[in-house]
Amino acid sequence: KTPGHPELDTKLGIDITTGPLGQGFATGVGLALAESYLSKTFGDKIINHFTYGIVSDGDLMEGLSQEAAELAALWGLGKLIYIFDDNNISIDGNVDKVSVTNQKTKFESFGWDVQSIDGHDENEIIKAVNNAKANTSQPSLIIAKSTIGKFSPNKENTSGVHGSPLGEEEMKQFLENLAWTDDLFEHPKEVYGYFDEKLSLIHI
């Protein structure tokens, strides 16, 4: 139910097929463009929302995302907000082995509003999103510095946790580090309640 490249399934809340790396980034730009056009056409009392996305190192390394990012700035899509999970890891290893791009400088040169935060601090995330929402003249990139596989004792900050299972023993130690005492696939009732509420809002 959680493929690496999600495909259209409105019952699961998946509105679009995003395809390979970078395509989801470009699709988000298209969604933000649609919001801008429809809001201007029918008025912001009818159409008025933000477009959010979480993007990866791999997404931003693709040429497709660069072209879309330039257009987003050119079109002034100020209600587009992306959080960049900046963990410096790709499926092949450290990103700095294959890329020299400073994403902050690149996006600023395009005309995006760029913020840098600690990706593990929820208060910084909330503050950055609110700052981005307050600036509707530019698309926003929030660079959230993070550690992939955090709390995994042997695979933290490695490509070994990128798209691969931790393994039984590693998962056991990972859960111990999180002080997780419930069964692996058991989650608090509050989690189910929250998602059930959100799913009820989806119109199929």
Q: What are the roles of these predicted feature ranges?
A:
Residues 1-74:
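Cofactor-binding active-site loop characterized by glycine-rich and histidine/acidic residues
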Residues 10-12, 22, 38, 42-44, ...:
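General N-terminal targeting signals
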Residues 47-49, 76-77, 135-138:
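Short, well-ordered loop/turn elements at secondary-structure boundaries
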Residues 54-55, 59-63, 81-83, 87-202:
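Conserved acidic/glycine
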Residues 73-81:
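Boundary/activation segment at the start of structured domains
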